[in-house]
């Protein structure tokens, strides 16, 4: 009966037509969000969800929002940069389908590049340290990439040196994510605007792990151009800590795309803090992510606790399934029924 009365009242409203239009638009928009047909896989990159943490955020009026970059088709934030580097090089006439592409990677960029290379018809050669997870290696090979390993001791510096040498010998086109401006350009044109729109301009702090520094450089550049100040916080491992995807670069290997003036503060994150926060995100927030994402949220928690009323945005770089073989989600890390 109540429903009938409400319907009758609604039908007698003078703005009934406007209500119909709004209702139909909302329905159409929700349907669009649920299932959108696209012509190519690359059209599904970006426009990732921004989710508010419900249980980990401090009770001081601050908010922590995380951008779920694992929702990209190859599973990480690096999908954006990979697409940008290849598409922009194509526009300049530097590469064409059938060419050999070379890149040094710690994992996620390699997977993303392998996906785009498969999609567009390139041959992909990827160089990485041999201590990266088996899941990452398998994903690259699944996309058809050739994987070349350097030793753990050589690390990413060794992988970068070998990639450069291969390029100089004419073995392929080096994309060079560490010095390629098309890397941060992807985040200047997509990630930054998305965050600004999704927070309705309320963001006060942006927190990002620093690997190639492409994400923090591009997002920061965009946010600096908006009408309100936003504090930019970068994260690097503490001395002696090892966090996949985050680096404490020696001066001679600092990525050329990095602009220190775009970062207000750099926090040191211990490996244990990153891993513990990663597991807490899974157990308490239902967000299954990788170690560098745990580091980003650990940094965001520091910022939020120290800044009541802050609106903090952090990047969830990838998904946790790429780290299962490393033991970071082993049973020994969880107490029965309680999680951590």
Predicted feature locations:
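Short N-terminal alpha-helical targeting/association segments
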Residues: 4-7, 95
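PLP-dependent amino-acid enzyme catalytic core
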Residues: 11-25, 29-340
């Amino acid at each position: 009966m109540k429903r009938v009365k409400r319907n009758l009242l609604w039908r007698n409203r003078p703005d009934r037509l406007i209500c119909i239009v709004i209702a139909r638009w909302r329905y159409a928009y929700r349907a669009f969000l649920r299932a959108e047909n696209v012509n190519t896989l690359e059209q599904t990159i970006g426009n990732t969800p921004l989710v508010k943490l419900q249980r980990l955020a401090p009770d001081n009026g601050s908010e922590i929002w995380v951008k779920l970059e694992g929702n990209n088709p190859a599973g990480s934030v690096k999908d954006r940069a990979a697409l940008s580097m290849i598409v922009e090089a194509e526009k300049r006439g530097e590469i064409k389908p059938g060419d050999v592409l070379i890149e040094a990677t710690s994992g996620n960029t390699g997977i993303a590049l392998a996906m785009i290379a498969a999609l567009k018809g390139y041959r992909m050669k990827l160089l990485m340290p041999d201590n990266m997870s088996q899941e990452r290696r398998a994903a690259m090979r699944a996309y058809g990439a050739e994987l070349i390993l350097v030793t753990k001791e050589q690390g990413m510096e060794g992988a970068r040196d070998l990639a450069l040498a291969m390029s100089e010998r004419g073995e392929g086109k080096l994309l060079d994510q560490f010095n390629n401006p098309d890397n941060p350009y992807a985040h200047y044109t997509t990630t930054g605007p998305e965050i600004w729109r999704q927070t309705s301009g309320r963001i006060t702090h942006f927190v990002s792990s620093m690997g190639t520094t492409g994400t923090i450089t591009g997002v920061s550049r965009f946010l600096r151009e908006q009408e309100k100040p936003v504090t930019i916080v970068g994260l690097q491992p503490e001395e002696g800590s090892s966090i996949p995807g985050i680096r404490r670069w020696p001066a001679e290997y600092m990525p050329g795309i990095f602009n220190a003036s775009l970062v207000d503060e750099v926090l040191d994150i211990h490996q244990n803090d990153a891993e513990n926060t990663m597991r807490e995100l899974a157990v308490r927030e239902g967000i299954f992510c990788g170690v560098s994402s745990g580091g980003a949220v650990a940094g965001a928690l520091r910022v939020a606790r120290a800044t009541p009323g802050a609106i903090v945005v952090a990047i969830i770089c990838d998904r946790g399934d790429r780290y299962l073989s490393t033991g970071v989600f082993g049973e020994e890390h969880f107490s029965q029924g309680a999680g951590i």
